A protein has these predicted regions:
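Extended alpha-helical surfaces
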Residues: 1-303
Length: 303
């Protein structure tokens, strides 16, 4: 296993409450290209692809808006997505591309084949909900086919944490809004099965099954949507600190530092100019909760 003494020793200290970055996560990635082994850099790419998923959903929902958006993907190529989809529809040989296999599988199973069906046209509710269902399906493919099977315990555990957070919040929201949680829970382990069926406050999960279930329940009970997001990021930050405490010069420390930069970046970008865009992203992540919560947040933003 490679050790990165010089790189890690030279990293500036950062904290969860920081509002100023020593450098951007994107610049950090470029520097790491020259430092990490090819195998370790691939682990970084696995983490980076999680962010790219939302750009793919945006593109599938409205290619024109996605292409014109201010924020653009760093890894995903819209042109490659278009050419791969065209090849899938025509049944021709794939052009050269850099898309991960999970995205190819997703496009084939849930986009191209769906375009060939007409049964959505008569169901307005299904048409309206389809982008959200696509998001869930893409998350399923990302975690189960790409991130969780990663040959690195840290990457797999981090992916499990994020999947658990996503699923727990989906379960809470489904219960609150009268939705069927089976439509929104990703995965089919014993934990996911309990989230799909249990009506208990903690969904019948013990701390042995999910060590942070009590913390997530506490976060969910917070009514202020921005404070809730902040609590989640603190939970993630502390998780990262604990996981790399005894791995001082390993790649896991570098991966954790990258993820912590991303956490700080998300909050430094929350200003008057980008507040609404970030707000919409937060709402999408939380499964588009009740209009009352949304209106309350918007009123707070104007103060």
């Amino acid at each position: 296993m490679a050790k990165y003494y010089a790189t890690i020793s030279g990293l500036p200290n950062i904290g969860v409450d920081d509002r100023k970055l020593p450098f951007s996560s994107e610049l950090f990635v470029e520097e790491l290209r020259e430092v990490l082994t090819s195998g370790d850099f691939k682990l970084l790419e696995v983490l980076r692809w999680e962010r790219e998923n939302r750009f793919l959903i945006d593109y599938l929902e409205s290619p024109e808006k996605a292409l014109e958006a201010t924020e653009q993907p760093q890894l995903l190529s819209y042109e490659e997505v278009a050419t791969v989809m065209d090849a899938l529809k025509k049944g021709t040989k794939f052009p050269k591309h850099h898309l991960p296999a999970y995205i190819i599988d997703f496009l084939k199973d849930f986009v191209v084949e769906k375009d060939e069906e007409d049964d959505l046209q008569d169901d307005e509710e299904e048409v309206r909900m389809w982008p959200l269902r696509l998001e869930d399906k893409l998350a399923d493919y990302y975690y189960t086919k790409f991130a969780l099977p990663a040959r690195n315990h840290f990457v797999a555990e981090w992916s499990r944490l994020n999947l658990d957070i996503r699923n727990v919040f989906a379960a809470f929201t489904s219960c609150n809004l009268g939705w069927d949680p089976k439509d929104y829970i990703v995965g089919d382990s014993e934990v996911e099965r309990k989230l799909k069926t249990s009506t208990a406050t903690n969904f019948g999960l013990s701390e042995e099954e999910m060590e942070y279930i009590a913390a997530l329940t506490s976060v969910q009970n917070e009514t202020d949507i921005t404070r809730r997001e902040r609590m989640l990021d603190v939970l993630k930050w502390n998780w990262l600190e604990e996981r790399v405490f005894d791995r001082t010069f390993n790649v896991e420390t570098i991966l954790a530092y990258y993820l912590q930069l991303r956490i700080i970046e998300r909050w430094t970008e929350l200003n008057e100019k980008t507040g609404e865009e970030t707000f919409r992203s937060i709402v999408a992540t939380l499964k588009k909760e009740s209009n009352d919560s949304l209106n309350e947040f918007k009123r707070n933003q104007k103060k």
